[in-house]
Structures are given as C-alpha cells and as structure tokens.
Amino acid sequence: AEAAQHQYSYIALGDSIVAGIGLPDAVYQRNGRYYDVSGNYQGYSKDCYVARVAEGLGLSRDQTANYGMPALMSGDLLELVRTGSCQSASINFSLPDLRQELKHAQVITVEIGANDVLVPIMYGIASAMGGPQVFEALLPMLEGDFRQMDASSFAALRENLDSLNITAQQRKALLKLLDSGIAEICTQSQASTLANLEALLQELKALNPDAQIVLVGYYNPVPLLPAPANPFVKHFRTLNRSVQKLAQQYDVAFASAAYTLVANDAHPTACGHKYLARQILKALEK
C-alpha cells in the first residue's frame, strides 16, 4: 500500500535565509550548478529560526518542514506552490507533495523577495566581469565560507577575484552597475515582488483558509555599506511598508525583520535567527 501523506503542522517557505545557509549545522551541498537541500527539510540547523519557531510552538521535527531554497525568488516560490517544482539557470527544486502538505498545515511562514534584487545583481556582476566563472569566484562567500572574513578567507577571496583578469571594459561595466544599475534593479523589482506575494497569498488562502500565515519582512543585507550609498536601505524599507499593508489586506500576520543581525555573506547570524523567531512567534500571538 502507498505510504500515507506526511502531515506537517508548521511549514516554512522561502529562500536561503529560511534554510539557515551559513549556520554550521545546516544541511546543504552544491550539485553541479544547483543546491541540494533535501536533507535540510527536516535536518535543518538547531539555530535556524524554523527550529526556534517550532520549539516555541511545541512542535517536533516530524511536525515541521523547512522548505528554504537557496537563490529562490518570489516568482519561483509562487511556481513551486502552484506546480510542485521550479527550475531556472540557478535553481532546480521539486516538492511534488507540497500542495497537499500545505492543506494540512496549521502555521505557514513565508520569507521571500530579497533575491528578487540580489540574484539579478549577481547576474549583472557576472555579465559585467566576463560570465559564469565569476560565480565560481564568489560562491565561497555565498555558501557561508567567509562569514567571519578572517585573514585567510579574505586572501582566498582576493585570489579568486584576481584570477578573473578583469579588463578595463569589464571594470567600466561593473562600476556602472554599482553606480546606478543596482538602484534601477531595486526599483524595477518592487512591483513584481508585491504581485508575486499577493498571488502567493491567494494560493495559500485557497489551499488552506484556516492556516495561520506569517509574512516575514526584510533587512538590509549589506549593513556595512553607509546608507547614502546603499540602495538596499530605501528598497527594503519601502518593500517592508508595502508587504505589511498586503498582510493587513489579506488578514495574515507580518513579522518585522528590520533589526536582524547579519554576517558577511548577507545571511543571518545565529543571533539573527533567534531574533527572527521571536518576531514570528510574537506575530502569531496577535
């Protein structure tokens, strides 16, 4: 007989922040161009916010699913919820039972949208600097190897970047991207992120009208960059306001993430995850 459908009480949807990328006991590995996080769905870090929220709700790992997917954008998550899979140049994820699982969840948290600007920026940097090999140079940082950025890790990053042999033309293209291109990407992504989030809420509400849903807000992923020169500050502040209004419109909770402590790789520290868990649990109590 076919195995009974697993029923999770708490399902966490989102990107690498949800997955706990960068935490020492997160379970993930690169498989060619893609990440394999299947072992993380229930083997997630004890320090990630999903573990702490589950603990706060009195739930075990058997009752909790961490569906955090590295490099996932809001449109990808919408496709994943609608069809059970999503694939592009940088992602390849499949959760064929997701819709059925969502129907039975009591709590669903959604943290998505930061990659709507970060992934296009990475592609822009790769394009400006000569293509796919740029990702190979920067991947150790994205994978959490440089979270503390000590002397040896900085030297390794410098060696990786020096090996690219950037031409004057590529340097010019990169400077243009950094000067105005990032701000343009931020502006262009606002409407699509909100549209995808609204469609996602409609899907979740249709699948499970009784579930408690929490939209998790955004933080500045590059806090060391001063505010006047940091386009992310304005972008995520504006997006937070818009997403909070969207949450009110659809009668779901909103958990602010504005003061999340971040490591050098733009992912939360263990303390950052603890803060996010507190914010989510607080939102669920309202």
Regions found by a protein language model. Give the residues of each.
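Serine-esterase "nucleophile elbow" of acetyl-processing enzymes
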Residues: 2-69
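Flexible, glycine-rich phosphate/dinucleotide-binding loops
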Residues: 19, 73, 222
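Short, solvent-exposed loop/turn and secondary-structure capping segments
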Residues: 21-25, 77-79, 119-123
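Glycine-rich, phosphate-binding/catalytic loops in enzymes
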Residues: 26-37, 83, 125-129, 232
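Catalytic-core regions of hydrolytic enzymes
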Residues: 69, 74-104, 193
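Alpha-helical cap/lid subdomain in secreted, periplasmic
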Residues: 92-270, 274-285
